[in-house]
Amino acid sequence: MNSPVYQTVIVGGGFAGLFTALHLAHEHYPRSVILIDKDERFCFKPLLYEYFDGEMDHFQVVPRFSELLKGSGVIFVQDTVESIDLHQREVKLTSGNSYNYSNLVLALGSVTGYHQVEGANVNAFPFWTQADAIALERHLRDCLQKAIKAEDSEQRRQLLTVVVVGGGASGVEMAATLADFLPHWYSALGGNSSEIRVVLLNHGKEILDADINNPLREIAERELKKRAVPIEIIVEAEATAILANSIQYKHKDKIETLATHTTVWTAGTSTHPLIKDLPIPKEHRDRHDRPLVTPTLQLLDFPEVFVGGDCAAVQDNSLPPTAQVAYQQGANIAHNLKAIALGKELKPVKVNIRGTLLKLGINHAAANLFNVFEVSGETAHLIRQGTYLTLLPTAIHDFKATTEWVDEEIFHHHLDPHDVGKKVVQAVEIVGAGVVGLLAARKLLKMLGDEDKGE
């Protein structure tokens, strides 16, 4: 008779998976932990725009899992999961290896969803990973180089036109980023920056509609017009086909064509194929095919399995697919896994939405604090960047205390609703006083990044 296997396997190294592993290590979890991800590096997706436009370096935004997990006792396996057998409690990898588990954590996130739009998966650029960011940057630089040499005005117009599909947070952040740095790049080549054209195509009547960032919509619309080149927003436009040199979309019952060599796709996500393949009945899934989980984030039919992040649907508790949600879920999953190991009672997961952060161009952002106070411009940019930097637990972040003022004072305190106004005033004062500290921290990051480039 085989001895029972007492180990926890975590599939997926996004926010939920990574922070589950790190919190297990921090809490001295008594069982072995294995983290499996197909990539060598963790991708800090909220800051991928900063990596893309050169504001931040790879060691900050896409650090290696081996560095993040060093000294934690967590075993990292870089491999692709081929299948998950919930009945046999086994995870099979494409390498031929397999792992049995006593507990499983599914944190696979979601994948880019093209919604059956013709040519989108071939001709559009997704923006989800480090590889996506590198591919898009190379393509755009190539387009600008060709535009400088192009004698035909129509060809040059196509090369200098970029269309972003999707008016949610990702689309808004992408459009704002492009509209700031593309003119800079083109001017450096000797081109006329006013020829750059950035178009944001949105299916709904308003950008950020039904999005957690909707309270920031008016600020976003205002800031999009203030970029180095104003962003054109086309609403009630449904993409119907993405071609190599154009995009077709339906607008007011007419099919329109926009000539462009670059279409960036940010128009939604789909459930991960491995999650779709799990033996979970339809009645235990939501309308997006994600598995329903209990308040403790366990599968209804397989309580030894926890699911967190974008690939989970918590019963009677709709949560936005954001980093702060996945981060908090990871901590709670770790707590409950330790409770199981020690024979203690599990606790329902509580997630506090502490605010929303939206990048609106280089050194500009908007922040909605506790849904009662809004900040925009460079102040919001510092809040956003400082908050995210404090989440990344690497050895080089020993200066964390320098930026802790943002994280602790603005986002991590539980506020009494009666004290919100007072606290917000304090928060603004703290932001002003802490700007120098954060700038010093950013300078340190830059110095460390320059050293790291030699690897």
Where are these regions (language model features)?
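FAD-binding core/adjacent interface of flavoenzyme oxidoreductases
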Residues: 1-5, 74-161, 250-253, 264
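Beta1-alpha1 glycine-rich phosphate/pyrophosphate-binding loop at the start
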Residues: 2-75, 162-163, 169-211, 435-455
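Short glycine-rich anion-binding loops that position phosphate/pyrophosphate groups of nucleotides
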Residues: 16, 109-112, 175, 269-271
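C-terminal, flexible cofactor-proximal segment of oxidoreductases
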Residues: 28, 329-439, 443-448
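A Rossmann-like FAD-binding core segment of flavoenzymes
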Residues: 30, 72, 76-84, 179-295, ...
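Short glycine-enriched, charge-decorated loop/helix-capping segments at active-site entrances
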Residues: 48-56, 121-125, 215, 279-282, ...
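FAD-site-proximal beta/loop scaffold in flavoenzymes
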Residues: 122-152, 245-246, 257-328
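Rossmann-like dinucleotide-binding core of oxidoreductases
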Residues: 156-215, 219, 231-232, 321-337, ...
